[in-house]
Each structure stands twice: as structure tokens, then as C-alpha cells.
Amino acid sequence: MGHMVNAVKQIPTFLDLGANALEMDVTFKNEEPTYTYHGVPCDAFRDCIRWEYFNVFAKTLREYTTPGFDKYREQLILLVFDLKTGDMNNAQARTAGVNTAKQLLQYYWNNDNNGGRAYVVLSIPDIAQHELIKGFKETLKKEGHENLLDKVGYDFSGPYLPRLPTLDETHEAFKKAGVEGHVWLSDGLTNFSPLGDMARLKEAIKSRDSANGFINKIYYWSVDKVSTAEKALKVGVDGIVTNHPDVIIGVLNENGFKDKYRLATYDDDPWETFGK
């Protein structure tokens, strides 16, 4: 999964390096998704201030994920929108969810008329913002496009302070949001942070694989080193966020990995837990 792809020119760059998914940062203005932009600080050796207007970026993503367009790339099957809503209260987050649904419906799904086919994950930075998901889902239903929810998954990634939520707290937030299935969970550190023991990641994977697990897929960020990618795969992640997709492709082709792992294709179900 290509990390921090926020400018239109970066899309083909990451795809040419082998990415089959892209992660974008969505910055809001008055609860309206306005820019794809991360800002400083960010991962080491990256340009933190690349950006585009959200509607332009969404329309461009449609061209890369809709058969028939010159830009179409069959490999691009998943889009992760990292929603920068951390400073919003729950009511504001609901409005942000409504507006995100409207903009994706218009600019990416083209009002469900030959729209982009990629799966979408909404990554929300705070478990207290469960109303964002409700607003998003209810808007698509109200607009008559409930079917598009089949293509959408959800991730609560925080908050990080004063501590990360427990898995039970995260599960409760999904219940409040009315989400059962289509659950992704992210874990990780910036690419310049010490790796650590991956304790939370291992706990999440154990929960995913349990009989009553609520998580469908787990992805880890930001993985730029061969050694880190190898450790993440051995632990059992479903996805890897990276600034260097070619490095991950190389690891997937190594002995010990190439017989167990491969890049996902459009025919794979992103909401199905592997191995269950």
C-alpha cells in the first residue's frame, strides 16, 4: 500500500513501483473534505506538503480505477482515506462523514454511473468519532446508493494520546457505529521509529484469528526496510503501508514468503478474514 499519496503526480509513481493500494490523507475545512494533504511532521525522506484538492484527487482516482479510461490500472484495488478529523467532536465528525459520502459519491463513484471500482477504507483517528461512520452510511442510503457500502470498510486508528484504545474499546466503537464486518485495523510507527516488540500488533492478530474476532484485516505502517517487512509478514499482517512498494515486492518474492503470500487482486474479498 503506497503511503501518503497526496498529489496526482504521485499516483502513477507508486503504481509503477508495484503498489496495489494507495493511502491518502484527507484534510477538512468546516467538516468538508477539502485537500489531500498530510503536512509536517511526516515520515523521514518524504515531502510532507504535497497536496491536491480533494474533488480533483477523487476524480483522478476514478480514472485510475475505472475500466475504459486511458489511466486505468487493473492492479489498483484499494483506497485508504486517512481522515484528519482528530480535532472534531462527535457531532462535527458526523457532518464530516455526511460530506465525505457526498463527495465520494459525486467525484469518485460518479453517482454510481461507471464510477471507480476500487474498494475503500475510511480510517478514522479517534474511536469517539463513531458518528462519522453513521453519517457516511446514512447519506449513501438516503441518496439511494446503499449498494456502494458493499465496497466500503472502516478503521479506527486512535487516538494515540493519552494512550491507544484497547481492542475491546475499539470493538465497542464499531458497535456504536453500527459496523459488523468490513473492519480493518491499523497499527504501526513512523519509518524512523524503533521497531519495538510489535506487542499490540500481535495482540490484534490473535484477536483477528480467534473464533469471536471482530477484525477482518490488519495492516502495518510505515514499513520501508526489508527486515521490518519480513517481521510483519511472519507475524501475520494482511497489508503493509510503505514508502517503497518495490521493497515489499522484493520481500514477497523471497524464499519463505513467495509460497505463502502474494499481492491481492480485485477478485480477493477485502472483508473476508484470511484462513477462516
Swiss-Prot record:
Per the annotation, which location comes first and is thus the protein's main one?
secreted
The EC designation for this entry is 4.6.1.-
Catalytic residues?
A: 3, 38
Q: How is the cofactor bound?
A: Binds 1 Mg(2+) ion per subunit.
Tell me the residue numbers annotated for binding Mg(2+). 23, 25, 82
- Name the cofactor(s) required for activity, per the record: Mg(2+)
Cysteine pairings via disulfide bonds: 42-48
Which reaction does this chain catalyze? an N-(acyl)-sphingosylphosphocholine = an N-(acyl)-sphingosyl-1,3-cyclic phosphate + choline; an N-(acyl)-sphingosylphosphoethanolamine = an N-(acyl)-sphingosyl-1,3-cyclic phosphate + ethanolamine; a 1-acyl-sn-glycero-3-phosphocholine = a 1-acyl-sn-glycero-2,3-cyclic phosphate + choline; a 1-acyl-sn-glycero-3-phosphoethanolamine = a 1-acyl-sn-glycero-2,3-cyclic phosphate + ethanolamine
Location within or outside the cell:
Secreted
Q: What are the UniProt keywords, alphabetically?
A: Cytolysis, Dermonecrotic toxin, Disulfide bond, Hemolysis, Lipid degradation, Lipid metabolism, Lyase, Magnesium, Metal-binding, Secreted, Toxin
A Gene Ontology cellular component where this protein is annotated is: extracellular region
Give expression by tissue: Expressed by the venom gland.
What protein family does this chain belong to?
Belongs to the arthropod phospholipase D family. Class I subfamily.
Q: What is this protein called?
A: Dermonecrotic toxin Ls4SicTox-alphaIII1i
Instruction: Tell me which species this is from.
Output: Loxosceles sp. (strain 4 GJB-2008) (Recluse spider)
Taxonomic path: Eukaryota, Metazoa, Ecdysozoa, Arthropoda, Chelicerata
